[in-house]
Amino acid sequence: MLPLLAALLAAACPLPPVRGGAADAPGLLGVPSNASVNASSADEPIAPRLLASAAPGPPERPGPEEAAAAAAPCNISVQRQMLSSLLVRWGRPRGFQCDLLLFSTNAHGRAFFAAAFHRVGPPLLIEHLGLAAGGAQQDLRLCVGCGWVRGRRTGRLRPAAAPSAAAATAGAPTALPAYPAAEPPGPLWLQGEPLHFCCLDFSLEELQGEPGWRLNRKPIESTLVACFMTLVIVVWSVAALIWPVPIIAGFLPNGMEQRRTTASTTAATPAAVPAGTTAAAAAAAAAAAAAAVTSGVATK
């Protein structure tokens, strides 16, 4: 830092030469800004070398994949599976590692529901979705940010540490590396991974008509099970009404069998004359005999 300051001061305020000029005292005005400060000896000419911290490098240009992902339209689809679950899909061209954010937007600046998912891939099932009380309309915003980096550091690498002053004093030749050494990967939140977010605004009421929501769709399995259970209930109901009839009829007297039993008994035994009928016939015979006797006495 000191040689650089001396060079700037010398350029701003040039000093007059003393006893032969600056050629006799090469170290008076300092070294150029693009020269190395680690010379091996005073007689050796100073060779210009590249310093990692002398000038910042050119800004990094995004790769073609990242540029395509940034310019690509949102390819996000949301389907409602159950009452409180969503199935989210997005295109793979957006990246490998994706972060997903879901939050409500109709609460006047306060998110009634918010969820975050880190390093996920499609498809993603979001369960236990927070629903507004009273069946009110709920607007949500879904943001997906994806990056093309998988566990490597994308930020600018730091230069290596400067050599010690003892090595420079001893005159040992030291050379700075042409490229700075890579540092070991740090935590994920220090890696500086670029993400390209794409957001989608939707409402839960708009998803009710989609074929992915099973509450509005009746699968063939449910229909068949419902028909079978209805048939079973009808059969059991009819059987419950019919099965007591033959059992109760077995305990009741049968009219046809009673008539057959009476006819056979009458044919086997002689007919009996009733007592009243016999007395009337005897009275009639006695009256006839008395009348005959009376008529015979009158003729004599």
Curated annotation (Swiss-Prot):
Coiled-coil region: none
Paired cysteines (S-S): none
Sample GO molecular function, one term: peptide binding
Signal peptide: 1-20
Family, as annotated: Belongs to the TMEM158 family.
Glycosylation sites: 75
GO cellular component: membrane
Domain of life from the UniProt record: Eukaryota
Primary role: Receptor for brain injury-derived neurotrophic peptide (BINP), a synthetic 13-mer peptide.
Protein name per Swiss-Prot or TrEMBL: Transmembrane protein 158
Annotated transmembrane regions: 231-251, 273-293
Induction pattern: Up-regulated during Ras-induced senescence.
Major localization listed first in the record, in broad terms: membrane
Subcellular location: Membrane
InterPro entries: TMEM158
Keyword Cell division in annotation: no
PANTHER family given in the database record: TRANSMEMBRANE PROTEIN 158
Reported modifications of this chain: N-glycosylated.
Keywords attached to this entry: Glycoprotein, Membrane, Signal, Transmembrane, Transmembrane helix
Membrane topology: Multi-pass membrane protein
